[in-house]
Amino acid sequence: MESIFGGFGDLVVPRPKEHLGQTDLSFGGKLLPALKICEDGGESGCGGKVWIAGELLCEYILEKSVDHLLSKTVNGTKQFKKVLELGSGTGLVGLCVGLLEKNTFHDGTKVYVTDIDKLIPLLKRNIELDEVQYEVLARELWWGEPLSADFSPQEGAMQANNVDLVLAADCVYLEEAFPLLEKTLLDLTHCINPPVILMAYKKRRKADKHFFNKIKRNFDVLEITDFSKFEHYLKERTHLFQLIRK
């Protein structure tokens, strides 16, 4: 995968140095103690900073977390047990879920924050910073590659161990990676009871629509609008979708 993903850093404009150091995020007091995120100023590429789509997804999760994470809005009454964030970068969204789990004393839910190898040290640093080592685990995951045993869907008695919630924020940014991301989403949902997929995305280029047009062959793409800051994020051209495997 080095040959495919090795150019990620070269293809992305370096991040401004103001995205360096620790940021505390409480999302208007919805998350206390505040989430602590270390940004690396672009040292690890585009993943080493907080992006607006990640903030949107956190806002939605915190607003809709009644009794348990999102259970009242996207999954009936079922408790999510295995959460996977794709392209985690700093780990913002996954760490938000993990800290929410820790603060509300829900037992048994594991959150996996995943990205390419060069971002794993930053993910681990933020996990330690927020003291969610029990709730959140960092794993290397290359889009387009076969899924590891941790994430590959199982059937029968083993399906209870499957990922049941997939989170992705600002993963649609590099056109060369579109087919790889699509393959990973297809692999994760290749089962009788596929996971819920929530994808937040900031519209930047016309090319981005090619990704959504292509995945509509295998997924219904539903825009989520029923949250308090919808209009705010709409002005920022940032959207939230649920992807449902056909």
Swiss-Prot record:
Which cellular compartments is it found in?
A: Cytoplasm
Q: Which InterPro entries match?
A: EFM6, Methyltransf_16, SAM-dependent_MTases_sf
Q: What is its EC number?
A: 2.1.1.-
Kindly report the protein's main subcellular placement as a broad class. Answer: cytoplasm
- Which GO biological process entries does UniProt record here? methylation
GO molecular-function term, one example from the UniProt record:
S-adenosylmethionine-dependent methyltransferase activity
Q: Name one Pfam family in it.
A: Methyltransf_16
Tell me the residue numbers annotated for binding S-adenosyl-L-methionine: W51, G87, S88, G89, D115, W143, A169
Cellular component annotations (GO), alphabetically ordered: cytoplasm
Which keywords has UniProt assigned to this entry? Cytoplasm, Methyltransferase, S-adenosyl-L-methionine, Transferase
Class of the enzyme per the UniProt entry, highest EC level: transferase
**Additional remark text:** Present with 1760 molecules/cell in log phase SD medium.
Say what the protein does: S-adenosyl-L-methionine-dependent protein-lysine N-methyltransferase that methylates elongation factor 1-alpha (TEF1 and TEF2) at 'Lys-390'.
Q: Which family does it belong to?
A: Belongs to the class I-like SAM-binding methyltransferase superfamily. METTL21 family. EFM6 subfamily.
Write down what this protein is called: Protein-lysine N-methyltransferase EFM6
Organism per entry: Saccharomyces cerevisiae (strain ATCC 204508 / S288c)
Q: Quote the gene name from the UniProt entry.
A: EFM6
